[in-house]
């Protein structure tokens, strides 16, 4: 089977969030299962030159966009055995950031149309298009409404993955006529209309042959008003074509036994080496090098979604415990300033790195004991999966992918891989942190918990098998 991934970002070329990690790792795992996957993304000027230089011009076409025919170069290259196509147009993709521009509706209308217009010119007969998030959602809708009468397209199936329902691609009504070349009959509540505007994600949901989300719990949550971002009714309507497949992590990147970024490599049989990473982390941040004081870390975007209001509410109570705390991330200024203030107030216990540093992030995972992730909502989450892989015990709220991947430890049955709480409540979180700290004081219990976490499989293998089965069912190959 031939699968075309349509994505707005992809590791190793360009990344702004978890979508890029998925687009980079899942195709590699699918390839191991015999699936022929190719990936199409924009040729951003921000892609490093050393990654771009191996691409060759495959074809030049023109994409109809309203009254214009826009230049579209199709570049072709290979990376790690996977074929990639870059859609080239400097007007749309030579920018200083991936998103957040006044003409994003036009940019990704062009990209969606370019994907479809390029299909006849690829040396690759596309059986199924797998699109992701709002940026390529209209591929599904346009394919269904404008291209299906063409024999080249009539058999193509679509899978649409929602990574984060919060970002939907909502644009003025004029986009329907001026860019998508669709008539007024599509501007109604059963089609693209969304509170007076149009909604790309809504179009993707309506037209896709199947919809996936990035965890089973998130699939259920988004059908309720609290999580549904005004699309919960639509998702309930299409529940029969909606499923949840939890993400994995790329174990060629996140593997403490092979990680070149950390001070000392280790695995479940050489856990004694993990303490060297803890000492190195304490030394790097200027923390007292105390082996028996647990390090609680957060590697995260500093935003409301990540549950930082809970952390802020009880942080000073956490500081009354014998702990050290390391925060790595950037985001909203109110949270950045709060953690910088805490680092000043508790200079012997709290250290903060505002920004992101890939090498340092690996060292934080390797050197920490506990990983705090009390999200308000979390479609899947990668941080807790990386933490488990590195033997760092997560403390999470039971939402989305956190609920699917972290199970609370029970001392009687010795089951579980972390500590969880249900309500979005600061003192529930505080109680759970204190509970985890009590177990940390018992080395026998803690070592067993760490080993259980590290022996779980959080790779993409299980997820890739689920996606292959889904593709097979849609293509009726099984």
Curated annotation (Swiss-Prot):
GO molecular function terms attached to this record: alpha-1,4-glucan glucosyltransferase (ADP-glucose donor) activity; alpha-1,4-glucan glucosyltransferase (UDP-glucose donor) activity
Binding-site residues for ADP-alpha-D-glucose, renumbered to this chain: 15
Keyword Transferase: yes
InterPro entries documented for this protein: Glyco_trans_1, GS/SS, Starch_synth_cat_dom
Transferase as UniProt keyword: yes
Reactions that this protein is recorded to catalyse: [(1->4)-alpha-D-glucosyl](n) + ADP-alpha-D-glucose = [(1->4)-alpha-D-glucosyl](n+1) + ADP + H(+)
Domain of life: Bacteria
Keywords: Glycogen biosynthesis, Glycosyltransferase, Transferase
Pathway: Glycan biosynthesis; glycogen biosynthesis
EC number(s) from the headed UniProt entry: 2.4.1.21
Any matching Pfam family: Glycos_transf_1
Gene Ontology terms describing biological process: glycogen biosynthetic process
Main function: Synthesizes alpha-1,4-glucan chains using ADP-glucose.
Family statement: Belongs to the glycosyltransferase 1 family. Bacterial/plant glycogen synthase subfamily.
Name of this protein: Glycogen synthase
Species for this entry: Bacillus cytotoxicus (strain DSM 22905 / CIP 110041 / 391-98 / NVH 391-98)
């Amino acid at each position: 089977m031939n699968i075309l991934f349509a994505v707005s970002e992809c590791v190793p070329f360009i990344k702004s969030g978890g979508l890029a990690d998925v687009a980079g790792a899942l195709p590699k795992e699918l390839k191991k299962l015999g699936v022929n996957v190719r990936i199409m993304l924009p040729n951003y000027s921000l892609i490093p030159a050393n990654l771009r230089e191996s691409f060759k011009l495959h074809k030049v076409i023109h994409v109809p966009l309203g009254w214009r025919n826009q230049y579209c170069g199709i570049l072709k290259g290979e990376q790690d055995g996977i074929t990639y196509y870059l859609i080239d147009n400097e007007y749309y993709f030579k920018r200083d950031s991936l998103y957040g521009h006044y003409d994003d509706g036009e940019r990704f209308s062009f990209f969606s149309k370019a994907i479809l217009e390029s299909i006849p010119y690829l040396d690759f007969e596309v059986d199924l298009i797998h699109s992701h998030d709002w940026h390529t959602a209209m591929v599904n809708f346009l394919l269904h409404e404008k291209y299906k009468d063409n024999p080249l397209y009539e058999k193509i199936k679509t899978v649409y993955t929602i990574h984060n329902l919060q970002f939907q691609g909502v644009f003025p009504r004029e986009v329907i006529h001026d860019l998508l070349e669709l008539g007024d009959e599509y501007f109604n509540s059963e089609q693209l209309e969304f509170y007076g505007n149009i909604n790309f994600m809504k179009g993707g949901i309506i037209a896709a042959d199947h919809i996936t989300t990035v965890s089973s719990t998130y699939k259920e949550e988004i059908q309720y008003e609290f999580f549904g971002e005004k699309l919960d009714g639509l998702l309930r309507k299409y529940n029969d074509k909606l499923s949840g497949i939890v993400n994995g992590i790329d174990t060629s990147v996140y593997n403490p036994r092979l990680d070149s970024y950390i001070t000392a490599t280790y695995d479940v049989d050489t856990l004694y080496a993990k303490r060297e990473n803890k000492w190195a982390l304490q030394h790097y941040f200027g923390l007292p090098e105390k082996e028996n004081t647990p390090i609680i870390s957060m590697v995260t975007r500093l935003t409301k979604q990540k549950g930082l209001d809970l952390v802020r509410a009880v942080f000073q109570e956490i500081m009354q415990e014998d702990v050290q705390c390391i925060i790595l991330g950037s985001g909203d200024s109110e949270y950045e300033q709060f953690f910088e203030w805490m680092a000043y107030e508790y200079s012997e216990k709290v250290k903060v790195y505002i920004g992101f540093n890939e090498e340092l992030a690996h060292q934080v995972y390797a050197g920490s004991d506990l990983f705090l992730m009390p999200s308000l909502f979390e479609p899947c989450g990668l941080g807790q999966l990386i933490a488990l892989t590195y033997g760092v015990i997560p403390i999470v709220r039971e939402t989305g992918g956190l609920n699917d991947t972290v199970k609370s430890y029970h001392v009687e049955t010795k089951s579980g891989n972390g500590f969880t709480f249900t309500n979005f409540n600061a003192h529930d979180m505080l109680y759970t942190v204190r509970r985890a700290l009590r177990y940390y004081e018992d080395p026998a219990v803690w070592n067993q918990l760490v080993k259980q976490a590290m022996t779980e499989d959080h790779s993409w293998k299980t997820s890739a098998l689920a996606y292959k089965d889904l593709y097979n069912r849609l293509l009726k190959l099984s």
